[in-house]
Amino acid sequence: MEKRTLLAVILSITVFYVFSLLFAPEKKPVQPESTGQAVSAPVSAGQPVAGGVQPSASAPSLPATAQQQDVTVRTGLYTAVFCSRGGALKSLTLKNYREKNLPDAQAVVLGSDADPSALTFSTRASGFNLPEGAPFVADATAVTMAGGEKKQLVFTHNSGQGFTVRKIYTFSGDSYGIKLDTQVFNNMAVPLVGTVQQVMTYPGLVKAKDSRFETAGSYLFSDNSLESDKLKDVSSASKLYDKNLQWSGFADKYFLTAILSEGGSIASVELRKNGAGFLESTVSSPRITVTPGQSVTVVHRLFVGPKDIDILKAQGNSLEQSLDLGWFTVIAKPLLYTLKYFYRYVGNYGVAIIIITIILKALFFPLTHKSYKSMKDMQKIQPMMAALKEKYKDDREGMNKAVMELYRDHKVNPLGGCLPMLVQIPVFFALYKALMFSIELRHAPFYFWITDLSGPDNLFGQMLGLPFVIGPLPLLMGATMFIQQKMTPSTMDPMQAKMMLALPVVFTFMFLNFPSGLVLYWLLNNILTIGQQMYINKLVND
């Protein structure tokens, strides 16, 4: 029985690990009947949409065409470059984040002037003639503000067909959030009916990678559920989401670009692979009706910045759900909040990890004690178990009955050593996710040679031509795992025991490329477990 329970534990851990990394729930989006059409209740002419401005009878007078121009916006947090093509965002440089963990490394740049996929929040329309990439004219060549200040940048498109579209970006010097008012002025003699669309293209402003650990792609929050799509998941046939949309955007491991609904201003989001092979997201407003001489405003909020859980939560609309921590999110996010709480006091995320590890070990001590005692009890009755197996080697039913009587007589629960450990598995995976995908640990130093808790321990670099770096932390982790294994009571036969000795070696190689913050947690957890076992041994022997 002990062999079977041990095997069950190992298989459970393996299945949880592989399944949580490689698989996600299947999404069931609605297939659209036609491209780019939003379905919603009509809005009365002359009324603002989703908290927009009051109706206006006159549109700004500008030429129908204008020379392409770029506008630079500088705040305390970022430098953004907008262009007149679609009134779109081309690139954004995050001043507080660096590409590499080096003193002279450049700041993180999202997007590129040379990348045709980088135009984000480009405006077009369905139902009236505003094509993608339509020329807009900016009211400034540069906008600069300090923290706490608010300033605007206005792009205007004169269609030459009796209507004008104006995009008003409102920036805050101390926020990654941007307000976008899209105004449609109708100077024609007939009503103007259609939908306003904001277009984003992947990879656009995110770092496009595709692996188990880099979950870059499209994310949106629809009907209280997070939906995600990678480029490979979307064909030329589009996917349509149109239920209770809160936000939509593109994200990678650490950064997010999103458009947020303001009072229901997102009616649908359509995903498709465009002719250039990029993943395109079209965010459509409810259908608007602009009567002659009036205007309608569609309001959105934008976000381009780090996936810091506090920053995301402050934006509202459940934007913090973009920090997808897998099946154990309900445990992982409280652990992440706890990690940040201790960081505020100690000023070092490595120390905060140590504090959390000690607290978790103390909380689980009763379970560990019970598990260890149960294994000790099982070890004591092994000679009697062996005798029963020999006695009933040709009578399986008789052997099972005798074994159960042996358990009952000695008050031993064969699952007593397994169940307490299974309870701790979700906590481990939750902490694993929190440490693996937390931007807080990105380039965060610990002490001594560990300068980046989000990267592997690479003190010794690549040795002996191996394709990975080597450092002391994973080696120490493997050594402590071996010591812990030798101290743990075992009822396995010699062959199984020898096979189990390979586990520390396997885990050491696995952890060579893991974030050093996670290896630090595992190492300290092993050390505390060794201390626990020494203490419990003393209690049991006494």
Swiss-Prot record:
Organism domain of life: Bacteria
One GO term describing the cellular component: plasma membrane
Q: Where in the cell is it found?
A: Cell inner membrane
Q: How does it sit in the membrane?
A: Multi-pass membrane protein
Q: Which GO terms describe its biological process?
A: protein insertion into membrane; protein transport
Residues spanning the membrane:
5-25, 323-343, 345-365, 419-439, 463-483, 500-520
Keywords attached to this Swiss-Prot or TrEMBL record, sorted alphabetically, are: Cell inner membrane, Cell membrane, Chaperone, Membrane, Protein transport, Transmembrane, Transmembrane helix, Transport
Q: Where is this region: Disordered?
A: 33-64
User: In which residue ranges is the amino acid composition biased (Low complexity)?
Assistant: 54-64
Q: PANTHER family per the record?
A: CYTOCHROME C OXIDASE ASSEMBLY PROTEIN COX18, MITOCHONDRIAL, OXA1
How it assembles, according to the record, is:
Interacts with the Sec translocase complex via SecD. Specifically interacts with transmembrane segments of nascent integral membrane proteins during membrane integration.
Protein name in UniProt: Membrane protein insertase YidC
